């Protein structure tokens, strides 16, 4: 990975924290933010996210920096870019998700043009006609 990872950012503020090995999508670990005895947090290297079920700290690289440094979003982005390998590589953004539902008015086949009314409806009588 060429950009700053979530584990590197957390280790910057908590050097004694041991990041979990990358085995699953969400890897259980001890939370460095409140110091616990049993794993109550999880790190995702694929999604670049952190979530603790005990203390509620969650987020990505930018939100962890904002939480620790108490800075604005723009300043957190500048800090993260300074931490990345080479110093001028932009921070890795979260992968874009596809919308799970169709937007009202979109046809099912995006390539079709013309009327959006299905042919079977035109021939039917309606209660108000």
From Swiss-Prot:
SUPFAM superfamilies: Zinc beta-ribbon. One of its GO terms (molecular function) is DNA-directed RNA polymerase activity. Pfam families: Zn_ribbon_DnaG (PF01807). Residues 87-129 are annotated as: Disordered. Keywords: Metal-binding, Zinc, Zinc-finger. Residues 106-115 have a biased composition (Low complexity). GO terms for biological process: DNA replication, synthesis of primer. This is Gene 58 protein. It comes from Mycobacterium phage D29 (Mycobacteriophage D29). The gene is 58.
